[in-house]
Design a protein with these regions (language model features):
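Conserved N-terminal beta1-alpha1 strand-loop-helix module at the mouth
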Residues: 1-66
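Non-catalytic positions within long, well-ordered alpha-helices that form the structural scaffold/packing
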Residues: 64, 72-75
Length: 76
């Protein structure tokens, strides 16, 4: 578990600037609590938003996993 709102912003600003002219695909898969922040920081960039711990189940009590429908709301 790594990340904090302030360090996420600094890291993503450097990443987005660093890949602006790169002929490659880049994705960032932050922990679930930071998806909203990271989605906002990546908006309009060529960096794709991904996610961690996608559950194979559509719903239910699966601690630590995230439902696909929940991730879709963030554009993952």
């Amino acid at each position: 578990m790594n990340g904090a709102r302030e360090s996420n912003a600094a890291l993503l600003a450097a990443l987005v600037g660093g890949v602006a002219d790169c002929a490659c695909d880049v994705a960032v898969c932050p922990p679930f609590p930071y998806l909203g922040q990271v989605a906002d920081l990546l908006a309009g960039s060529k960096v794709t938003l991904g996610a961690q711990t996608l559950s194979e189940h559509a719903a239910g009590a699966f601690t630590g996993e995230v439902a696909g429908a929940m991730l879709a709301e963030f554009g993952c």
